[in-house]
Amino acid sequence: MQRSLSPHDQRLALTPGTTFAVHYADSSTARALLSDPARWTLGVVGYGAERPNFMPSTCPFVAAPLLPATGEAMFEIWISTLPTRPCRIGPVSGACNDELVFGAIRLEDVADIALEDAVEKSYLAIFDFLEQTGLVEPIRFWNYLTAITADERGVERYRRFNIGRHRAFSARLRAPIPPVASGVGGHWGTSVIYFLAARDAAKPIENPRQVNAYEYPPIYGPSSPRFSRASIYSSTLTRTLFIAGTASIVGHETRHVGDLAGQITETTENLRALIRAADQEEACSRDDRWALKVYLRDQAYREPVETALHGMFGTACEPLYLRGDICRSDLLIEIEAVRQTIAG
């Protein structure tokens, strides 16, 4: 029996002119979403799952190297109310409508190629993909690396990743401020990058409690992490706030090392700071819908995090809990968010 969708989710997904929405779904809900003739699909990300047999052959799919905290296969589904068409250019595949494109690439993460070279090559392929689709403004990146904090020939893999991303962005990124991104470590499968891009750029938002990540001091590596803390993307009828992976960092330093409760409190304070900064640009409304992705170093952390998020967001959020390594070994949790507000 197919699981039904909430009236609010249906309204957001199907309002004429609304470009896109994201849903985190188990297998039964994913089947319902993907079989609905009133929706088109931009892309699907699987967690703890390979491509399901109920997915249309033309639907872009990427298997992420992260596992759901529940142990049950989960799917991240980007749907569109505008017709989509599949597109594949070189190693990058995805789908687009007239305003937005979803794409994904598997990293060539092998022993005989330096990670920074593989990352640079992948990002340059992404920029080639965007140029050919005509949707040239990247608005959100997700970078999922296996063994993200492991040492690789004397240099942490995440630092090598940042070197490669920095090279590609220096060569091809049009905007002076980099887009929102997350970087999280996985434990199985293949390292992947997936992304959203649009015809029009998003407006960057920074956190007054933190140093901009792209301005971090060199103690974090020879190349700073090139991402913004948040941004607002405006489409026809929807305002979308993207919040990057957010953790217990103040200034540029980790706070509450080894203290889960302290890190939860600091992380939610950073989320509140970003929401306040965004609301100075775009007022929220009672129709706001939140989709949260929570990365847990240990799945036992889920219950206290869930309690904190329920206190902060109530029933207005759709959370997905994933087992993943944060890009600093002293961070226990990381939370990212998408808020969609129907304008008018």
Residue locations for each model-derived region?
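N-terminal presequence-like segments and the immediate start of the first folded domain
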Residues: 1-344
